[in-house]
């Protein structure tokens, strides 16, 4: 069963671009190494451009757990966290229905 993780966070004022750049680096450096990764979406709020929501889809919870426990992933997250006001608010779950065009 596919696994979805969603997290919401706010960038420190003036560090919005650093957050976006961090996700771009993840795509270039981490994504090719991550087994089971399907897709991700990084979105910023229409009401506050420093507020973000990320949704990441993996083929299974096992793939998600393998990535989240990887030391390189941990280092990437700590770099991202240095640009955030507080720890993200997380949601992890099983995909019950997935609709695409």
Predicted regions located by residue number:
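Short, well-ordered beta-strand segments in beta-rich or mixed alpha/beta enzyme
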Residues: 2-10, 40-70
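Glycine-rich beta-strand-turn "strand-cap" elements at beta-sheet edges
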Residues: 1, 39-50, 76-101
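Short, surface-exposed ligand-recognition loops at beta-strand->loop->(often short) alpha-helix junctions
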Residues: 10-23
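Generic structural motif
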Residues: 12-14, 59-61, 95-98
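An amphipathic, aromatic/His-enriched active-site/gating alpha helix that lines ligand/cofactor pockets
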Residues: 25-38, 57-91
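Short, flexible segments with low predicted structural confidence
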Residues: 2-4, 19, 35-36
């Amino acid at each position: 069963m596919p696994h979805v993780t969603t997290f919401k966070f706010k960038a420190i004022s003036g560090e919005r671009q650093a957050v976006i750049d961090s996700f771009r680096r993840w795509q270039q450096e981490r994504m090719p190494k991550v087994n089971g990764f399907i897709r991700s979406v990084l979105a910023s709020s229409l009401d506050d451009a420093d507020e973000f929501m990320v949704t990441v889809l993996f083929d299974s919870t096992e793939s998600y757990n393998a990535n989240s426990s990887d030391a390189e992933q941990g280092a990437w997250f700590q770099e991202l966290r240095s640009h955030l006001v507080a720890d993200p608010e997380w949601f992890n779950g099983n995909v019950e229905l997935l609709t695409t065009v």
